[in-house]
A protein has these predicted regions:
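Charged, surface-exposed helical/loop "interaction arms" that form contiguous linear patches used
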Residues: 364, 368, 378-381, 399, ...
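Charged catalytic and DNA/RNA-contacting regions of genome-maintenance
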Residues: 1-334, 350, 354-363, 367-459, ...
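Extended, charged helical/alpha-beta scaffold domains that provide interaction surfaces
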Residues: 455, 462-486
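ATPase nucleotide-binding head domains, primarily ABC-like/P-loop NTPase cores
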Residues: 35-38, 233, 288, 303-304, ...
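Terminal-proximal interaction/regulatory segments of ATP-powered molecular machines
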Residues: 475, 842-871
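Conserved phosphate-binding elements of NTP-dependent enzyme cores
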Residues: 1-2, 9-13, 20, 539, ...
Length: 871
C-alpha cells in the first residue's frame, strides 16, 4: 500500500489542527495549498490547479502563490469569508537535517488583519466580542491593527436593540459570541441580514470564571480591573477574555499590543439607530454604498490615515456632553480664525505616517525597513507640529500639544540603524546603516571587494582561454559559473567541469571558483543573518515604547481632525453653533451640508428652523413631492449631529440644545426577503422610534401611513403626531413631520406645540416652480398632477387626471379633522387588565422560560382573567 511522503505527512498533521482554515504551506518561495484547500483556492483565486506526487497512487491537487505577494491573495479569501492559516518554514532549509521544520505563525481572519495592504486607511477594522446573559450584555470592540479596545456593559429592558445600536456604531468585520446569544433571535437575525461580518460561536468552556481571570491576568497583570476599567464581576470580563483567547489562538504572538482599553457608557454618545445612520447617509450612501455624497465626504479634509479613522468615529459617535462638545468647538474656532497657523499645521500633518498601525506591525515583527525609516521621518516632524499647535494660543490645542512626544530618542535610534535607501524587505540585506555595527561593515567589505576579485579572475581566465567574451555569472541553482560561447569552448582547459549546455555556449565551474564562492557566500549569508538579527532587535526596542508612541499618535490624529473641521468651516462659510443643555434647536439660514456641495455653482436655498419642547414642538410640513421636504428635514438632523461632533455648521446662526438621539423614518422600502411590505417596514421603524425616543430626542418622520387605506393611514399618522408631540400622552420631543395628509394641518391650535409649515410653490397656469423655501402655514395644494407632469407623464394622462380630480373634489368636499374625544371613545375601550395580572407579567423572565412553563403560565393567566370578568 502506498505511503505518504514525509513532507505530506507533515502537511496533513498541521492541517489536522486547522480544519476550518485554508492552509498556506510555505515551500521555498511559494505558499502551496493541497487537496481540498487547493480545489477551493484555485476556484476562488483563479489559480492554475496542478498536482504533486505525495506518495499515494494519485497526485495531490495543488496550487500556489508567491510568498512575496501572498497578502493580496489572502485578502481576497478573507473578503469571501474564509480564514487562512499561514504555515512558515521555522528553520533555514540550508541547515535543516532532513525535513524542514514548519509551524503556524498566525491565522488571518476578517477581524485580525494587520497588513496595510489588506486594510482601508480611513476606517478601523474591529472585531467584536459579545457576552449575553440574563438580559444584560458585555461588549468589547477591538481594533487589532491599532491595539485599541472599547468596552461597555449594557443593562436594560431593550437589550437586543441596545446591542444592535452598538454593533452599528463600530461596524465590526468579525463577531465572537457566546452560546447564550443564539437565544436572542433579534440580534442574530440582524447580524445575518444587515452586517457583512464573519461570526464565530465560542465554546461555553471559554467563559469559565477561572479561565476568564487567568486570561485577563496574563494580558493586563494582577490588577487587570484597575488597569482596564473592567468591573471584576461584570459581563465585560467574559467578552474581553474570550477575545484575548481567540487572539492567542489566531495570532500566536503580538497580542501584547492590545493594551489600550477604553471603557465607555453608551449614554456618553448620541443614539443613532441603524435606520437613522442609513437615512442620514453619514458614512456611505443609500445607493451605491459610496463615500461621495455623505457627511464624511464633506468633512474629510484630514491629512493622515489616523485622522481619517478618528473623524469617522466622531461622526459615528456624536457626543452628548455640552462641555466636551464645546472643548472641541473652541479648538476648531481657534484654527478657523488663524489661517496661517492652520495652513502650516496641515502642511506638517501631510508628512505624518500611520503611527498607530505601524506600531502594531512593529510589535508583531512584520514592519518593513522602509516603514521603520518612515517612522523616523514622522518623528522629524513632531517638534514642528507641537510648536504649531502651541502657537495658536488655545488651551485645548495646547493640551493636545503637550500629549505629543517628540520621540527624539526613537528617531535617532532609527536613523543610526537603518539605511536611508533600505529596501522594503530584509531578504537581500542592505537594511542596516553604515557605521552602526562593525561586523556588518566588515562583512560588506568582504562582499564588495569580492566583486573586484571576480573581475580580476574573469580578466585572467579570458587571457588563459583566449576567449574575449568569457564571463563569470551567478544563479541560485549552480552558484558562480564560467560561461564560454560556442566559438571558444574548444579552448577550455580539461580542469573546467561542465555544468550546463546552452544554445549559445557552455557553463563550467572550477575548483578555484568554488573555493572563492564559498568565501563570498559565507560572508553574504552571515551578513543577511546579522542584519535580520539587528533589525529584529531594533523592532523590539521601538515596541518597548508602545505607550509613548500610541499616546502621540492619538493626539496627532485629534489635531488632524480639528484642523480638517476648521478647514471645511472656513471654505464653506460655516458658523460656530451655540451648544448647551437647553431644548432649543434654532437655525438661521441652514443649508444641507452634502447637497450644497453637490450643487457647487448652483444656489442652495437656505431655510430657518425653530424647534423646542414648548410652543414649537412639532412642525407639520406639507407640500408637493420633489419640493424639498426630505432635504429640509435631513439638513436639520445633520446640523444637530454636526454640532454635537464639535463641528461648525452650514448656517448663518445656530443654537443646538443637546439631543440624546436622532430618529428618522424617511423614504419607502420593501423587505421582500423577510416578507415585509413597505407599510410593514414603515410601521416597524415607527414602532422603534416610539419605543426608544425620549423628550430630549430629535425625531424626523416622513409620510407616515402610506401603503394602506387613506383613513387607516391618516388615523395612524394623527395618532403618531399626538403621541410624539403631546407630553401628556407620550413623549413631547422635538419633531419634524412631513405628510401628504393635509387634514393633519388642522392639528395646529388643537394640540399645543404643533405648527404648520410648507414648501413654497409658484404656480403659473398648469406649471409650477419649487421655490425651496419653508414658510409658515399649511400647503394650499399637493400639486401631485403638476409633479407628475414634471416627471414626464404624457399630456393625455395628466389632462385626464385633472378631469378626474375635479370630479372627485366636487363629490367629496373636504371635512375638517377634529381632535379625537378620547372620553367619548372609552365605551369602546377594552376592559382593564387586572393589576395582579400586570404584576405577574412584569415579573415574568421570558429569557429563562421553558415551553411547558409558558403553557402553564398561560393557563393560570386565563383562569385569572376569566374569574375577573365573571366577578
Amino acid at each position: 500500500m502506498a505511503e505518504l511522503s514525509p513532507m505530506m505527512q507533515q502537511y496533513l498533521e498541521i492541517k489536522k489542527q486547522h480544519k476550518d482554515e485554508i492552509l498556506f504551506y510555505r515551500i521555498g518561495d511559494f505558499y502551496e495549498m493541497f487537496f481540498d484547500d487547493a480545489l477551493t483556492a484555485s476556484k476562488e483565486l483563479d489559480l492554475t490547479l496542478t498536482g504533486k506526487q505525495c506518495g499515494l497512487e494519485e497526485r495531490a491537487p495543488m496550487c500556489g502563490v508567491p510568498f512575496h505577494s501572498y497578502e493580496g491573495y489572502v485578502a481576497r479569501l478573507i473578503a469571501k469569508g474564509y480564514k487562512v492559516a499561514i504555515c512558515e518554514q521555522v528553520e533555514d532549509p540550508a541547515k535543516a537535517k532532513g525535513l524542514v521544520k514548519r509551524d503556524i505563525i498566525r491565522v488571518v481572519t476578517p477581524g485580525t488583519v494587520i497588513e496595510s495592504s489588506m486594510l482601508q486607511d480611513d476606517r478601523n477594522n474591529y472585531i467584536a466580542s459579545i457576552f449575553l446573559k440574563d438580559g444584560a450584555a458585555g461588549l468589547c470592540f477591538a481594533d487589532v491593527s491599532t491595539g485599541t479596545a472599547h468596552i461597555t456593559e449594557l443593562k436594560q429592558s431593550k437589550i437586543a436593540s441596545a446591542v444592535i445600536t452598538e454593533l452599528c456604531r463600530y461596524h465590526p468585520s468579525e463577531v465572537l459570541m457566546n452560546p447564550g446569544l443564539l437565544d436572542c433571535r433579534e440580534i442574530t437575525t440582524y447580524i445575518k441580514k444587515n452586517m457583512t461580518c464573519s461570526v464565530e460561536l465560542m465554546e461555553e468552556e471559554r467563559y469559565a470564571p477561572g479561565l476568564v481571570s487567568i486570561a485577563l491576568e496574563n494580558q493586563f497583570g494582577r490588577d487587570w480591573a484597575a488597569q482596564t476599567g473592567i468591573a471584576p464581576k461584570g459581563l465585560v470580563r467574559f467578552a474581553m477574555a474570550a477575545l484575548l483567547e481567540y487572539l492567542h489562538d489566531t495570532q500566536i504572538k503580538g497580542v501584547e499590543r492590545l493594551k489600550t482599553v477604553i471603557s465607555y457608557n453608551e449614554a456618553q454618545f448620541m443614539r443613532l439607530s441603524p435606520v437613522t445612520r442609513a437615512n442620514l447617509e453619514l458614512t456611505e450612501t443609500l445607493r451605491g454604498r459610496e463615500k461621495r455624497g455623505t457627511l464624511l465626504w464633506v468633512l474629510d479634509k484630514t491629512s493622515t490615515a489616523m485622522g481619517k479613522r478618528m473623524l469617522r468615529s466622531w461622526i459615528e459617535q456624536p457626543l452628548v456632553s455640552s462641555a466636551a462638545i464645546n472643548r472641541r468647538l473652541n479648538a476648531v474656532e481657534s484654527l478657523v480664525h488663524q489661517t496661517v497657523q492652520r495652513g502650516d499645521l496641515i502642511e506638517e500633518l501631510h508628512y505624518i505616517s500611520d503611527l498607530e498601525r505601524l506600531m502594531t506591525r512593529t510589535v508583531y515583527g512584520s514592519a518593513t525597513p522602509k516603514e521603520i525609516y518612515a517612522m523616523a521621518q514622522t518623528c522629524e516632524r513632531l517638534p514642528s507640529l507641537k510648536q504649531q499647535a502651541e502657537s495658536c494660543n488655545c488651551p485645548e490645542l495646547a493640551e493636545l500639544s503637550a500629549q505629543i512626544d517628540a520621540l527624539d530618542d526613537i528617531k535617532q535610534k532609527i536613523y543610526a540603524a537603518v539605511d536611508p535607501e533600505a529596501p522594503s524587505t530584509l531578504k537581500d540585506g542592505g537594511v542596516i546603516a553604515k557605521g552602526y555595527h562593525p561586523e556588518v561593515d566588515e562583512l560588506r567589505s568582504i562582499r564588495d571587494n569580492t566583486k573586484g576579485v571576480l573581475a580580476q579572475l574573469e580578466t585572467r581566465l579570458r587571457q588563459e582561454t583566449g576567449s574575449p567574451k568569457l564571463k563569470i555569472g551567478f544563479n541560485h541553482v549552480f552558484g558562480y559559473f564560467i560561461e564560454v560561447s560556442n566559438s571558444y569552448k574548444s579552448m577550455v582547459p580539461e580542469t573546467y567541469i561542465r555544468k550546463q549546455t546552452l544554445t549559445s555556449g557552455e557553463r563550467y565551474i572550477t575548483q578555484e571558483l568554488k573555493e572563492l564562492e564559498s568565501k563570498i557566500l559565507g560572508a553574504h549569508e552571515r551578513l543577511i543573518a546579522l542584519e535580520h538579527r539587528l533589525f529584529s532587535e531594533l523592532l523590539e526596542t521601538i515596541g518597548g515604547q508602545l505607550d509613548r508612541i500610541q499616546r502621540t499618535a492619538n493626539a496627532v490624529a485629534e489635531l488632524d481632525v480639528l484642523a480638517a473641521l476648521a478647514q471645511v468651516a472656513a471654505e464653506n462659510n460655516y458658523c460656530r453653533p451655540v451648544v448647551d443643555d437647553s431644548d432649543e434647536l434654532h437655525i438661521v439660514e441652514g443649508r444641507h451640508p452634502v447637497v450644497e456641495q453637490v450643487l457647487k455653482g448652483s444656489l442652495f436655498v437656505p431655510n430657518d428652523t425653530t424647534l423646542n419642547c414648548g410652543e414649537d414642538r412639532c412642525l407639520i410640513i406639507t407640500g408637493p413631492n420633489m419640493a424639498g421636504k426630505s432635504t429640509y428635514m435631513r439638513q436639520n438632523a445633520l446640523i444637530a449631529l454636526m454640532a454635537q461632533i464639535g463641528s461648525f455648521v452650514p448656517a448663518a446662526e445656530c443654537h443646538v440644545g443637546v439631543v440624546d438621539a436622532i430618529f428618522t423614518r424617511i423614504g419607502a422600502s420593501d423587505d421582500l426577503s423577510a416578507g415585509q411590505s413597505t407599510f410593514m417596514v414603515e410601521m416597524t421603524e415607527v414602532a422603534e422610534v416610539l419605543k426608544n425616543a425620549t423628550s430630549k430626542s430629535l425625531v424626523v418622520l416622513d409620510e407616515i401611513g402610506r401603503g394602506t387605506s387613506t383613513f387607516d393611514g391618516m388615523s395612524i399618522a394623527r395618532a403618531v403626531v399626538e403621541h410624539i408631540s403631546d407630553p401628556s400622552k407620550g413623549l413631547g420631543c422635538k419633531t419634524l413631520f412631513a405628510t401628504h395628509y393635509h387634514e393633519l394641518t388642522d392639528l395646529e391650535g388643537t394640540i399645543a406645540g404643533v405648527k404648520n409649515y410648507n414648501i413654497a410653490v409658484k404656480k403659473r397656469g398648469e406649471d409650477i416652480t419649487f421655490l425651496r423655501r419653508i414658510i409658515r402655514g399649511p400647503a394650499d395644494d399637493s400639486y401631485g398632477i403638476e409633479v407628475a407632469k414634471l416627471a414626464g407623464l404624457p399630456g393625455s394622462v395628466t389632462r385626464r387626471a385633472h378631469e378626474v380630480l375635479r370630479a372627485l373634489e366636487a363629490s367629496a368636499p373636504k371635512n375638517k379633522v377634529e381632535q379625537m374625544d378620547f372620553d367619548a371613545l372609552q365605551e369602546y375601550a377594552s376592559p382593564a387588565v387586572p393589576s395582579e395580572m400586570m404584576e405577574q407579567l412584569e415579573a415574568l423572565d421570558v429569557e429563562t422560560l421553558t415551553p411547558i412553563e409558558a403553557l402553564n403560565f398561560l393557563y393560570e393567566l386565563k383562569k385569572t382573567l376569566k374569574g375577573s370578568l365573571n366577578s
